[in-house]
Design a protein with these regions (language model features):
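Core catalytic region of metal-dependent phosphoesterases/phosphodiesterases
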Residues: 1-78
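Glycine-rich phosphate-binding loop signature in dinucleotide/nucleotide-binding domains
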Residues: 5-10, 91-93, 122-125, 176, ...
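Divalent metal-coordination and catalytic microenvironments
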Residues: 13-14, 18, 33, 43, ...
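Active-site environment of divalent metal-dependent phosphoester hydrolases
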Residues: 21-24, 45-50, 105-107, 130-141, ...
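Active-site-proximal segments of metal-dependent phosphoesterases and phosphodiesterases across multiple
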Residues: 57-64, 93-124, 158, 200
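Short acidic-hydrophobic surface loop/beta-edge motif
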Residues: 86-94, 140-142, 177
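Anionic-ligand binding region
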Residues: 114-156, 162
């Protein structure tokens, strides 16, 4: 995905949070974000790593993975996580872009296409609102403004599947947002990656409950 971002010539990169919890290479991931020079907002999974209370119930297995991740990150990595802010506000091409994880109010909020009232409320003070959390690529215009959810880089899945049958797809999702004096437009990207290489990284990582995680990826 990073190669695709570089190929299309994106001028500004923003990460909408949930960066490393559950992944096989947490320290390497933070290093890659640093190399990209991108602003990163705080997601609920990042907050969980930092010991904050989050809305979604957690399991003993998730807590074991959290402890392992914290160990992998070390003090310097945890310091980087603590620097993540709930929102990032950018002024680009005369457009106000507000970036968050769930909503500008909370990383736990869920914004969906059918939630017109919530979307109307959050778009009041932005030309573009970018949010994640649901792992679902979608966009909607609200007057002259634009909401965009870029999907998920590492845990993309088919939202038509029952929750108990979810399998992650081997694609990295992101969105390109084009801005000029006329407004904003969006293009969704889905970049295939080598799932066998990912499986090897998970097996080699020492991550707790790796076998259960491997079963979540589509074959």
């Amino acid at each position: 995905m990073v190669a695709d971002i570089e190929r299309v010539g994106a001028e500004v990169v923003v990460c909408l949070g949930d960066t490393v919890q559950g992944g096989a290479q947490p320290a390497e991931t933070l290093e890659r974000l640093k190399a990209l020079g991108c602003a990163t907002v705080l997601g609920n999974a990042d907050a969980f790593l930092l010991g904050e209370d989050v809305a979604e119930p957690t399991t003993p297995e998730q807590e074991q993975i959290r402890d392992w991740t914290v160990e992998q990150l070390g003090p310097s990595g945890m310091q980087r996580l603590r620097a993540f802010q709930p929102t990032a506000e950018l002024e680009l091409e005369g457009q106000k872009v507000l970036c968050c994880h769930g909503s500008p109010r909370s990383y736990d909020d869920i914004l969906l296409p059918e939630d017109q009232t919530a979307l109307d409320a959050w778009m009041v003070d932005a030309d573009v609102l970018a949010g994640g959390h649901t792992h679902k690529q979608w966009t909607r215009r609200i007057g002259d403004a634009l909401f965009v959810n870029p999907g998920s880089v590492g845990l993309a899945y088919d939202h038509h599947q029952p929750r108990e049958a979810i399998r992650f797809q081997p694609v990295a999702e992101y969105a390109l947002v084009f801005l000029d004096e006329r407004g904003a437009a969006v293009e969704f990207r889905r970049i295939p990656y080598d799932v066998d290489e990912l499986r090897e990284a998970i097996r080699a990582s020492g991550r707790p409950h790796a076998d259960e995680h491997l079963r979540m990826y589509a074959t």
